């Protein structure tokens, strides 16, 4: 089977039994706006439901995997608006990560350039992560006055352990691929020119295994590792509603859009 499906913001390429889902906003470094996330959820669910697909790769057009949420879109949101609307906006990211985590087939994320915020969260939601040696990954929400949402905290704690998860989430720093391979977030690092080939090798390795056994094992491991995730998932939205109404959030996002240094006050 060979199939190519292309929406304006997400592309799907299916070759034989391997599907590749490609983020396609290279002009804005694959920033995640609402429509891209909706398209990504739809395509990921469609791929998961396809019994002929044995493994799935997440990749990207352009130099970066994804710089996370489109802050220009976020800056246009009315923080004083409906609480229900604010919660629903926040729930979309959680739905995206849940959809990716629940894809039946093994998933491999191929990271190049920068993967920060929501981009890093998409990578964490996959089963395996490979990266080019110049890739950098981080969670910059704290630097714009936001909490880490999308029910991603349990993922990073499970992958990194408590101390390193705090360091990545609370610092907002971008860390290099070799460091994150040592930490356990990345499974393998390669040269920039070898990333696509390495992703295909990982996908083939898992596509060639008995699919029923592989998919049952994946589900069992995820259920065990993330058993408490559902219990705390609503904290993200509650914290977001508070953060989005703070003066610091308005100042930090405004500074990002205006390309100046923010001056947070703690209010």
Where are these regions (language model features)?
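Glycine- (often His-adjacent) and acidic-residue-rich active-site loop
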Residues: 60-96, 115, 145, 227-228
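Conserved CoA-thioester-binding segment of acyl-CoA-metabolizing enzymes
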Residues: 1-61, 98
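Amphipathic alpha-helical segments at domain termini/boundaries
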Residues: 1-24, 173-207, 215-225, 252-267
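Crotonase-fold acyl-CoA enzyme core
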Residues: 98-212, 246, 251
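Catalytic-core regions built around general acid/base machinery
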Residues: 43, 92-103
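Short loop-to-helix capping motifs
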Residues: 25-26, 50, 209, 246, ...
């Amino acid at each position: 089977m060979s199939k190519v499906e292309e929406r304006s913001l997400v592309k799907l390429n299916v070759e034989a039994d391997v599907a590749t889902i490609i983020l396609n906003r290279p002009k804005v470094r694959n920033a995640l706006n609402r429509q891209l996330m909706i398209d990504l959820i739809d395509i990921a669910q469609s791929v998961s439901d396809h019994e002929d697909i044995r493994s799935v790769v997440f990749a990207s057009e352009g130099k970066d995997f994804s710089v996370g949420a489109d802050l220009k879109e976020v800056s246009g949101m009315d923080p004083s608006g409906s609480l229900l609307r604010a919660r629903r906006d926040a729930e979309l990211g959680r739905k995206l990560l849940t959809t990716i985590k629940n894809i039946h087939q093994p998933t491999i994320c191929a990271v190049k350039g920068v993967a920060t915020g929501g981009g890093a969260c998409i990578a964490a939601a996959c089963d395996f992560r490979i990266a080019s040696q110049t890739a950098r990954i981080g969670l910059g929400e704290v630097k714009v006055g936001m909490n880490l949402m999308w029910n991603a905290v349990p993922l990073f704690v499970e992958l990194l352990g408590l101390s390193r998860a705090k360091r990545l989430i609370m610092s907002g720093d971008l860390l290099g691929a070799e460091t994150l391979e040592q930490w356990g977030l990345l499974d393998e690092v390669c040269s920039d020119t070898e990333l696509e080939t390495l992703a295909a090798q990982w996908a083939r390795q898992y596509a060639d295994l008995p699919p029923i056994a592989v998919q049952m094992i994946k589900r069992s491991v995820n259920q065990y590792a993330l058993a408490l995730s559902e219990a705390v998932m609503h904290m993200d939205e509650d914290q977001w509603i508070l953060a989005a109404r703070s003066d610091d959030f308005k100042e930090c996002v405004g500074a990002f859009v205006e390309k100046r240094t923010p001056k947070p006050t703690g209010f």
